[in-house]
Amino acid sequence: STKYEGEDIELFKNELFIYLLAKQKNISFIPKILSYDCDKLIICTKNVGISMQDYCDGYGCEFDDFIPGIRTIYNKLVKFGYYHNDLRLKNIVINPNNEKLYLIDFEFTDREYKDLDEEDIVKQISRKTRSKKKSR
């Protein structure tokens, strides 16, 4: 028998699915999965940087400068048919050397939009998109 609740297992399966999808589709803004353990509900990924939260605390960055990059990777995930649904500064990772952005923590990722958007990040990237539509 397992010591995990059904909900924990569902969240783990959800997250594992996204990491495996990213590996299969070679999605560059999701860290590569290195290993996983279904019994212990552990997923190991390549270390690609630090959270945007830690980066901005430590390096003193302007979050607004990163909105276009966050919008790009968020919209790419949506194009694959999934909403992150937990988009927060701690779930956006940045490589401090080249400022490449990644998304992590896919427990709540779903084909339906259900983000509580507690940090207003989805609202910010959506608002900036509408006001700066580019003609193609």
Language model features with spans:
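Conserved hydrophobic alpha-helix
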Residues: I73-L77
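Residue-level recognition of conserved beta-strand positions in structured domain cores
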Residues: S1-K3, S35, K46-N47, D105-F106
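Hydrophobic residue at the +6 position relative to the catalytic HRD Asp in the kinase catalytic loop
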Residues: L87-I94
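Conserved structural core of kinase catalytic domains
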Residues: D8, K23, F29-F66
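C-lobe/activation-segment region of protein kinase-like
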Residues: F66, K79-Y83, N95-R136
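Short, glycine/acidic-enriched loop or turn micro-motifs at the edges of active sites
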Residues: G49, L89, F108-D110
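ATP-binding glycine-rich loop module of kinase domains
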Residues: S1-L16, L20
